[in-house]
A protein has these predicted regions:
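A short acidic, Gly/Pro-enriched loop at the edge of an enzyme's catalytic core
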Residues: 73-83
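Conserved beta-strand signature within the Rossmann-like core of class I S-adenosyl-L-methionine
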Residues: 109-117
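Class I SAM-dependent methyltransferase SAM/SAH-binding core
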Residues: 21-72
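Class I S-adenosyl-L-methionine
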Residues: 137-166
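Residues lining the SAM
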Residues: 86-87, 115
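Conserved alpha-helix/loop element of class I SAM-dependent methyltransferases that forms part
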Residues: 1-16
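A short glycine-rich, Lys/Arg-flanked "PGG" loop and its adjoining helix->strand segment in the class I
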Residues: 97-108
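A short His-aromatic
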Residues: 90-92
């Protein structure tokens, strides 16, 4: 989430009333950062009912949806000014097929912020999926590698991919 804050403050402009999707929102950690930055029009989606229960208790989200990002969701396309997906695009969670859906949900001119582990970027097909869809977005920023979970046994280096939908 601190990397998301840095991107919002330095590299892209997202107005305060903008509609934001916290994709794979889990317990709402990213939404807490967004709220601190005075964003308040946030929708969350996650596959775990238990995680969503915790997220709901924080009273940050306008709407929470329990669905998988691995296939087309019930959410209307082209509606979000910003789609954030951190800590989700990884082995055992959500695979590269979700890239298509995340782009579909983003408005033309809107932004996507995706964190993807370097270890699996090519191996699991995220690189291939982004290349396949390269006519649907422009790269704004690719962060330097960073340790996403410093105190976790799987402390793989990740990168933040900031894209703008065309």
């Amino acid at each position: 989430p601190s990397k998301v804050k840095q991107i919002l403050e330095k590299y892209i402009t997202v107005k305060k009333g903008s509609k934001i999707l916290d994709a794979g929102c889990g317990t709402g950690y990213v939404a807490e950062v967004l709220k601190a930055l005075r964003y308040n029009n946030i929708v969350g989606i996650d596959y775990s009912k238990d995680m969503l229960r915790v997220a709901r208790s924080k009273k940050i989200y306008k709407k929470l949806v329990c669905e998988s990002l691995s296939k087309k969701t019930s959410l209307k396309g082209n509606q979000f000014d910003l789609v954030i997906c951190t800590g989700v695009l990884t082995s055992g969670h959500v695979g590269p097929s979700s890239i298509k859906e995340l782009i579909r949900l983003t408005k033309p001119g809107g932004y996507l912020i995706l964190s993807i582990s370097e270890k699996i970027f090519s191996k699991l097909g995220f690189k291939r999926e982004l290349e396949k869809r390269s006519n649907e977005y422009n790269y704004i920023k690719l962060s330097k590698p960073f340790i996403a979970l410093p105190n976790h046994k799987d402390s793989a280096r990740s990168r933040m991919h900031t894209l703008q939908r065309v």
